A protein has these predicted regions:
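Active-site-proximal cap/loop segments of hydrolase catalytic domains
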Residues: 1-117
Length: 117
């Protein structure tokens, strides 16, 4: 099983939405320097290879990892009939700054791990 909080599941999608600055160019050049592509490294494009239950959690106000990353992944996994549970933290940020969110996160993870381990 796997637990993922605020994942980047689509590298191409992320790169296309990132601010273009000098640091971005170095990052992009590094990632594109090998034979593999962003798509080959993106979980969103490798759904067929995923064969474990996944718990996916994300805050809907995450400014570091856009929630579309989780939504797209969940939708594609669900459509493929994969075992995935998706939890959105309303008004949640990337750092689980809200204490209630942290407690809820830990409870969800504990419940999921007890079920699959």
């Amino acid at each position: 099983c796997a637990v993922s909080f605020a994942p980047i599941t689509n590298l191409t999608g992320l790169i296309n939405t990132m601010e273009r600055n000098e640091g971005f160019k170095v990052y992009e050049d590094y990632l594109r320097s090998d034979d593999w592509t962003f798509d080959q490294a993106s979980p969103l494009e490798n759904i067929d290879k995923i064969n474990v239950p996944i718990l996916l959690l994300h805050g809907d106000r995450d400014l570091n990892s856009p929630i579309i990353q989780s939504r797209s992944f969940y939708n594609k996994m669900d459509k493929a009939g994969k075992n995935i549970k998706y939890k959105i933290f309303k008004d949640g940020d990337h750092f689980l700054s809200n204490e209630e969110h942290r407690i809820e996160f830990l409870k969800e993870v504990e419940k999921f791990l007890k079920q699959y381990l």
